[in-house]
Amino acid sequence: MLLGKDNQAIGEQTVAVILIDLVNDNDEILPSVYEDAVFYNAHSINAFYSESSYQQTWLEGDVFGWYHVSNSNACSLLDSEVFDIADADINYLDYSRYIIIFRNNPQCGGVGTSTFGKITVNTPDGEIIASIARIYTDSIYIPYDSSLTMQSTIAHEFGHSLGITGHANAYDCGSVTLTNEVQ
């Protein structure tokens, strides 16, 4: 449940988006595209959570990277490795939510994982309480007009970061999504 005045999912969410390129083909999309997709455009993750929460939750933050990692066989890195790579650019005490996007090879596939709410995280700047969403993609495309895009995966995993633990698990609602009766 996300209600209550002490809920950490209410109010401004300070977000650092960290872009990690494990492919290194110089074909990644511009960080500004991620900035717009997460924070600024009409279909942004910020707009989604702001509207869904009746303007009680909103995102503020920055995008960092691309950081190029030479191990092209890797599908991801440990969080501590990511924090070390981006340390020169980020003061980890300034953010309480992290979205790490790994651009990897096609054999790695694309999914996401996340903490459920905030956890204790060790960073080069010290111990913080933060959430971490990790997105694994072999795509350089981040459209926002389809429910099956990387942006919807980011929004989904960020929901877990806020503490949303449930899944519909592909529940078929039939022809009615909301009803007073079980179908």
Kindly label every feature range from the protein language model.
Residues M1-V182:
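Active-site-proximal segment of zinc-dependent metalloprotease catalytic domains
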